[in-house]
Design a protein with these regions (language model features):
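A general marker of short, structured functional hotspots
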Residues: 4, 27-30, 53-54, 125-127, ...
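Conserved hydrophobic/amphipathic alpha-helical signal-anchor segments
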Residues: 33-73
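Periplasmic/extracellular, small/polar-rich flexible segments of pilin-like filament-forming proteins
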Residues: 59-147
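N-terminal single-pass transmembrane signal-anchor helix
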Residues: 1-36, 42, 46, 50
Length: 147
């Protein structure tokens, strides 16, 4: 009987390397998408905080706050956004209460794009909020309620 050497052949190693390459090619884009969505959730949470302040202002004053800068958003609405690094600009329109945010430091696919949160008053004095976005905002990264 012949004694065969122990170990893997070159073909077997190449097959394993090819399989690992295919798995990496599938996994990396998925991972990137999940990290973008996680970073965008910070922006969505900040916008929801501002929406709570706008709701309270509207219910107290029966008008919309006019806050064109992040400083005025914080002082006029009494909300603290903390250090939200993903927002380059946030404002609240005094005309219709729309919250507008420009995102940054997330990914080239969404940086510079705009998200909006628009209120609709209902009879009992509360507000219904609807998400919006700029036309070039990638569909896979839009807020869940707006997909």
């Amino acid at each position: 009987m012949k004694n065969f050497g122990q170990g893997f052949t070159l073909i077997e190693l190449l097959v394993v390397i090819a399989i690992i390459g295919i798995l990496a090619a599938v996994a990396l884009p998925l991972y990137k998408g999940y990290t973008v969505m996680a970073k965008l959730s910070e922006v969505e949470n900040a916008m929801s905080t501002v929406a709570s302040g706008v709701t309270a202002f509207y219910q107290d004053e029966n008008s919309w706050p006019d806050c064109p800068t992040v400083i005025e958003v914080g002082s006029s609405l009494g909300v603290s956004l903390g250090a939200v690094l993903r927002i380059s600009q946030i404002s609240v329109s005094g005309v219709d209460g729309m919250i507008t945010v420009s995102v940054q430091n997330i990914d080239s696919m969404v940086d510079g794009k705009t998200l909006t949160l628009s209120p609709t008053p209902i009879a009992d004095g509360s507000l219904i909020w609807d998400w919006g976005w700029s036309a070039d905002f990638p569909p896979q990264f839009r807020p869940k309620s707006g997909r």
